[in-house]
C-alpha cells in the first residue's frame, strides 16, 4: 500500500516525462525518515551514461516520470531512531541500489548488487509499491545499510562518480585478482569508467596499458592518468606486439567492438572482464579461449561492504573522478554532450547551489 502524502517529505528535482529524454523540474514526495533510514540534503549528483539510456528508455524498462541519478552525495539532515552508523552532519552517499532482500546467499555474502530482489535507486519499486526516485533532486531518504560514508578528505563533487564508475571498476580488479603489484592489466576505453579504472589499478601497484581507438588519448592516458603504456586498438602492429602480455583486461566500452583482438592480448589464464553494457550482443570467438584457458567474465557495480571499502581506498590514495561541474539547468545540454562523448570524464550536477526547491 502506498504511503499517504501527508506522511511523506516534499521533494524537488528534475525528471524525464517520456522517452524523448528531455528533463524538466518535477515535484514529488519521498517517504518520511523511518527508524533505520537516513535523510540527507543532496549536494552533488553525477551523471552516468546509464542515466542517458534510462531517460530514453533504450533498455526497455523505464517508467515515467523518471528522476535519474545514482551517484548521489550530500550531508545528513535526519536519522531514524535505530540508525547506528550515521549522525546529522555526516558526509554520505548513495550509489546504484537502495534495497535488497537482505536474506539470500548473495546478500549474506555482502553482494547485495546480485540480489534477485535488489531495488535500483531510481526507476524501480520499493516493497510498498512506491517508486524510487534518484539523485537529480534536493533530498534523499534511504536505509542506512545502503548508504556509505564519504571521508572528509574526499571532495564531494569528485567522489560522487565513484559510487558507480568507481565501484564498477574497483570490484572486478579485486574479485578477479587483478590487484597484485607487478601484474599487467589493460583498460579498454578511456571514459567515465576507464579513467577511474586506471587510477585504481595504478594505486594497487599494477602495470596499466590503456587500449583505445583514439590515438589522441595517448598523452592524456600516460601523462595525466599515469598509465604505463598505450595501445591504439586499430593499429595492427601495436596490437600484434602486445599479444599474450596481459594478466587481465577491464573492458569499459558500451559500444559495439570486437573481442577477438582483446582476447589475443591476454596471457594464459588471462581474464577479460566486461563492465560496459553494449545494447546489442557481441561476437565471442571460443577457440582462442580454449588455447590458453582464458576467461571472459562480467561484473556489475559492487556490494555495500565493498563500496565502502572502495571509497576508503580512494580517500587513502587521493582518487577522485575527473569532472565537469554543471548547474542543473544545463542538464539537457549535458545529456546531448554525453551522447557525443563530449565530457572529460564525468558530469556532476551542483544540486546544492543550483536546484530551485519548491516552497
From Swiss-Prot:
Q: What class of enzyme is it?
A: oxidoreductase
Q: Which reaction does it catalyse?
A: D-mannitol + NAD(+) = D-mannose + NADH + H(+)
Question: What does the record note about the cofactor?
Answer: Binds 2 Zn(2+) ions per subunit.
Please list the cofactors this protein needs: Zn(2+)
CDD domains associated with the record? CAD1
Gene3D superfamilies according to UniProt: Medium-chain alcohol dehydrogenases, catalytic domain (3.90.180.10), NAD(P)-binding Rossmann-like Domain (3.40.50.720)
The record, for PANTHER family, names:
ALDEHYDE REDUCTASE
Q: What is this protein called?
A: Probable mannitol dehydrogenase
Q: Which organism is it from?
A: Fragaria ananassa (Strawberry)
Amino acid at each position: 500500500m502506498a504511503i499517504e502524502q501527508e506522511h511523506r517529505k516534499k521533494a524537488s528535482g528534475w525528471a524525464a516525462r517520456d522517452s524523448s529524454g528531455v528533463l524538466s523540474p518535477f515535484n514529488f514526495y519521498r517517504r518520511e525518515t523511518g527508524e533505520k533510514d537516513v535523510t540527507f540534503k543532496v549536494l552533488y549528483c553525477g551523471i552516468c551514461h546509464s542515466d542517458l539510456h534510462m531517460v530514453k528508455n533504450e533498455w526497455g524498462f523505464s517508467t515515467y516520470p523518471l528522476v535519474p541519478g545514482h551517484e548521489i552525495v550530500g550531508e545528513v539532515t535526519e536519522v531514524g531512531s535505530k540508525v547506528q552508523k550515521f549522525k546529522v552532519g555526516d558526509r554520505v552517499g548513495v550509489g546504484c541500489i537502495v534495497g535488497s532482500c537482505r536474506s539470500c546467499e548473495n546478500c549474506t555474502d555482502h553482494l547485495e548488487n546480485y540480489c534477485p530482489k535488489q531495488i535500483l535507486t531510481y526507476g524501480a519499486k520499493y516493497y510498498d509499491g512506491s517508486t524510487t526516485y534518484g539523485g537529480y533532486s534536493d533530498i534523499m531518504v534511504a536505509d542506512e545499510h545502503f548508504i556509505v560514508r564519504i571521508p572528509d578528505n574526499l571532495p564531494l563533487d569528485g567522489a560522487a562518480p565513484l559510487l558507480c564508475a568507481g565501484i564498477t571498476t574497483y570490484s572486478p580488479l579485486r574479485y578477479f585478482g587483478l590487484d597484485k603489484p607487478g601484474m599487467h592489466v589493460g583498460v579498454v576505453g578511456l571514459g567515465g569508467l576507464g579513467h577511474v579504472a586506471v587510477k585504481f589499478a595504478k594505486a594497487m601497484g599494477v602495470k596499466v596499458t590503456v587500449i583505445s581507438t583514439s590515438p589522441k588519448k595517448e598523452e592524456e592516458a600516460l601523462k595525466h592518468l599515469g598509465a604505463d603504456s598505450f595501445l591504439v586498438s586499430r593499429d595492427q602492429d601495436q596490437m600484434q606486439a602486445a599479444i599474450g602480455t596481459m594478466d587481465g583486461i577491464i573492458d569499459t566500452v558500451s559500444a559495439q567492438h570486437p573481442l577477438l583482438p582483446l582476447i589475443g592480448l591476454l596471457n594464459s589464464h588471462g581474464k577479460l572482464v566486461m563492465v560496459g553494457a553494449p545494447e546489442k550482443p557481441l561476437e565471442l570467438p571460443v577457440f582462442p579461449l580454449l588455447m590458453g584457458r582464458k576467461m571472459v567474465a562480467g561484473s556489475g557495480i559492487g556490494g555495500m561492504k565493498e563500496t565502502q571499502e572502495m571509497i576508503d581506498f580512494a580517500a587513502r590514495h587521493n582518487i577522485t573522478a575527473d569532472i565537469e561541474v554543471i548547474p542543473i539547468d544545463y542538464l539537457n545540454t549535458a545529456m546531448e554532450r554525453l551522447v557525443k562523448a563530449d565530457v572529460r570524464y564525468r558530469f556532476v550536477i551542483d544540486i546544492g547551489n543550483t536546484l530551485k526547491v519548491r516552497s
